[in-house]
């Protein structure tokens, strides 16, 4: 998958879903609730008033976006343009949790604009 751009091959999607289904089943056997984000086509381009990128490649690792602490979910912001709308896959779950639990809280960090002036693609990481 290294260096690939655009939609992932269907066989890799199917294999990943099989692995996730098996992992979810193991967790559920232990009494752990498993919720899945809304499927999203991350091969689509992203356009805002400040930038355009041809793909959302790299989206979906929830460990990068969300941190659960008790009944609160903290949402980080993504500094890569291709991941700017990644949070949208999780918003239906946030709504569900809010409806289920009166103590549920969702805190989100401010999103950067990622204009050409403040986004430096060649900055060493």
Regions found by a protein language model. Name each.
Residues 1-125:
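The feature marks the mature, well-folded catalytic cores of soluble enzymes
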């Amino acid at each position: 998958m290294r260096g690939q751009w655009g939609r992932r091959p269907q066989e890799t999607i199917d294999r990943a879903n099989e692995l996730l289904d098996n992992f979810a089943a193991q967790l559920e056997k232990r009494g752990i609730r498993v919720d899945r984000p809304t499927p999203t086509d991350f091969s689509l381009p992203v356009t805002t008033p400040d930038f355009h990128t041809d793909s959302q490649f790299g989206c979906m690792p929830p460990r990068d976006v969300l941190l659960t602490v008790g009944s609160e979910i903290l949402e980080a912001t993504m500094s890569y343009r291709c991941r700017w709308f990644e949070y949208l896959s999780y918003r239906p779950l946030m709504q569900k949790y809010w409806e289920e639990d009166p103590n549920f809280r969702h805190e989100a960090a401010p999103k950067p604009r990622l204009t050409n002036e403040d986004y430096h693609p060649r900055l060493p990481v």
